[in-house]
Amino acid sequence: MYLQELLKGIQVEKIIGNMDIDIEDIYFDSRFVTQKSLFICIEGFKTTGSLYINEAIQRGAVAILSEKEIAIEGTTTIKVENSRKALAAVASRFYKFPTNTLKLVGVTGTNGKTSITYMVKSILGYYNINVGLIGTISNWIGNKEIEAVRTTPESLELQKILNEMVEQKVDTCVMEVSSHALELGRVDHTKFTMGIFTNLTPEHLDFHEDMDHYRNAKKKLFYKTTLCNIINVDDIHGKMIAEELKEEQIPLITFGMNQQADVYATDLKINLKGVSFQLHMGQDSKEFHVKIPGLFTVYNAMPSILICYILGLSLEEISIALEAMKGVPGRFEVVEEIQRNSVIIDYAHTPDALENILISTRKFAPKRIITVFGCGGDRDKTKRRIMGEISGKYSDYSIITSDNPRTEEPLKIIEMIEDGIKQVTDQYKIMIDRRCAIEYAMKIAEEKDIIILAGKGHEKTQVIGNEVFYFDDREVALEIARKEGLI
């Protein structure tokens, strides 16, 4: 595509050089630049793309787009006000505006995004509908799995994936949309058929400053939709968003446990094997069963059912497919091989998520709940004390350990968690090494105790300092169980 065509619709402040050149690819990472490509300099948090212009040119870039005015002999340079926004616009055009063709469902909120996207993929896939998924665990183009680097890909990668979905005849893509992606413009120039709001609890406040900024970032999704939005109004922030959207006459459907919602659930039954509930939608009512325990499962199932219903499936069809679903990796995942007591792997790494899983487990726990958890380093520090209080309040015994300490001192993170837990209980132990913490939990657990390994879920790495080590909670639990003769 010619550079002049590629830059249509972008506010260009200055161009130096020839615009009549053919661009064969686009990059923002100089390490991957190829011949006849456009290199876009992204202003990052740790470095800036303009430092890598020479490398990009050496590798074959024929044009440079930057927020800085640069003159380079033999290379076309383009100055723009915001290179991230320009990247999104250029990427969408280069990959032929894939969301003009593809049905795209965006799911945003602090918790529940992964579970909802997997539920929708599972339900639609049950009826052989070609489905795409973009999210935290992995990306899927039909039956092809692609590794996910972040919850929502950078705009260039996103448009490339969406374009491949169109080429592979994918009917619908369901996608996790993070607040970072919305705030940083990764989903600019992307049309969503539907937008889903799950809930909002303190998270990423190191980035968003406060809850108002966090909510406003999430709300941006609902102005990008072409059909409707589905909002959880049991959540105070969801209720605020719904009221604002109604005032602006933006189509939406509300859901919750409250019968004032457009769609609501009653007659909940929750145990270790799953949940059942009655869903009420207008004049229709239907019982649903899901093999994932917890109240949060009902909150995840309701929008999933609505999405699939709007996309054309009947409630009966959805019910059959949802009951057949086995679960979501690292989301209340019971390690079935261990029988003496229940070991549950969950991604709960926010105060709300940890509280939800502990309260849900308490409702059917026959004996003690032993929780192994930590908090990530180089991330929001305000949640550490809160999570300590929550584990202390709802667990019978807690083991505070490491969870991706990154460049922070692990013990310092643990001490901040301890500040919270010691306010409510003395039933806890500190063990910096996560493997040792899991082993200790399994050694002290008695028959029918429930061990919750919280925070990492599907993750298969532990980040300590600047090094990444292989670590899988599930595999570690199984290794210890075999060693202790529990399998």
Curated annotation (Swiss-Prot):
Which compartment or compartments is the protein found in? Cytoplasm
User: Is this entry keyworded Thylakoid?
Assistant: no
Q: Does the keyword Zinc apply?
A: no
Cofactor section:
Mg(2+)
| Residues where ATP binds | G109, T110, N111, G112, K113, T114, S115
What are this entry's molecular-function GO terms? ATP binding; magnesium ion binding; UDP-N-acetylmuramoylalanyl-D-glutamate-2,6-diaminopimelate ligase activity
Domain of life per record:
Bacteria
Ligand binding (UDP-N-acetyl-alpha-D-muramoyl-L-alanyl-D-glutamate): S30, T151, T152, S178, R186
Predominant location of this chain?
cytoplasm
**Could you say which EC number(s) this protein's record lists?**
6.3.2.13
For the motif Meso-diaminopimelate recognition motif, what are the positions? 403-406
Enumerate the InterPro entries for this protein.
Mur-like_cat_sf, Mur_ligase_C, Mur_ligase_C_dom_sf, Mur_ligase_cen, Mur_ligase_N, MurE/MurF_N, UDP-N-AcMur-Glu-dNH2Pim_ligase
Cross-referenced Gene3D superfamilies, in alphabetical order?
Mur ligase, C-terminal domain, Mur-like, catalytic domain, MurE/MurF, N-terminal domain
Write out the catalysed reaction. UDP-N-acetyl-alpha-D-muramoyl-L-alanyl-D-glutamate + meso-2,6-diaminopimelate + ATP = UDP-N-acetyl-alpha-D-muramoyl-L-alanyl-gamma-D-glutamyl-meso-2,6-diaminopimelate + ADP + phosphate + H(+)
Reported modifications of this chain = Carboxylation is probably crucial for Mg(2+) binding and, consequently, for the gamma-phosphate positioning of ATP.
Q: Which GO terms describe its biological process?
A: cell division; cell wall organization; peptidoglycan biosynthetic process; regulation of cell shape
Protein family membership: Belongs to the MurCDEF family. MurE subfamily.
Q: What does this protein do?
A: Catalyzes the addition of meso-diaminopimelic acid to the nucleotide precursor UDP-N-acetylmuramoyl-L-alanyl-D-glutamate (UMAG) in the biosynthesis of bacterial cell-wall peptidoglycan.
Q: What is this protein called?
A: UDP-N-acetylmuramoyl-L-alanyl-D-glutamate--2,6-diaminopimelate ligase
What organism, scientifically named, is this protein from? Alkaliphilus oremlandii (strain OhILAs) (Clostridium oremlandii (strain OhILAs))
